[in-house]
């Protein structure tokens, strides 16, 4: 984590929790109007990571380990607040994505949809690979 933060540490805030339950207790203690939703990423998710309107400002994105994913109680909490997103993979040949890849895909899709910089974004655009312009 320290290496990944490079020289951006002054711009961010990192808090380490002993367990998911400790995190959830911390999250519940935040004033409800400022808390945001819990959104998990899992191969068991029912909604695509790039589904329209999948993210809102203030969302907390949860990623689990490559082996075990997010804890079962996190699935329950996320379903109740923000849902569970799925990043598609070919499960016949791939068990899971590397955690850093999943985080990159999820975070940048959330930023694209929320568009906090005020740039216009065409959420209907989907590249047509293999077709000539």
PLM regions and their residue ranges:
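Post-transcriptional modification and biogenesis factors for structured RNAs
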Residues: 2-133
């Amino acid at each position: 984590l320290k290496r990944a933060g490079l020289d951006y540490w002054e711009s961010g805030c990192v808090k380490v929790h002993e367990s998911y339950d400790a995190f959830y207790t911390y999250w519940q203690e935040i004033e409800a109007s400022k808390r945001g939703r819990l959104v998990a990423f899992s191969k068991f998710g029912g909604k695509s990571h790039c589904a329209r309107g999948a993210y809102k400002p203030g969302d907390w994105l949860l990623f689990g380990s490559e082996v075990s994913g997010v804890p079962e109680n996190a699935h329950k909490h996320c379903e109740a607040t923000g849902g569970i997103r799925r990043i598609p993979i070919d499960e016949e040949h791939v068990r899971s994505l590397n955690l850093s890849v999943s985080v990159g895909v999820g975070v940048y899709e959330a930023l694209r949809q929320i568009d906090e910089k005020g740039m216009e974004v065409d959420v209907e655009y989907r590249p047509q690979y293999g077709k000539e312009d």
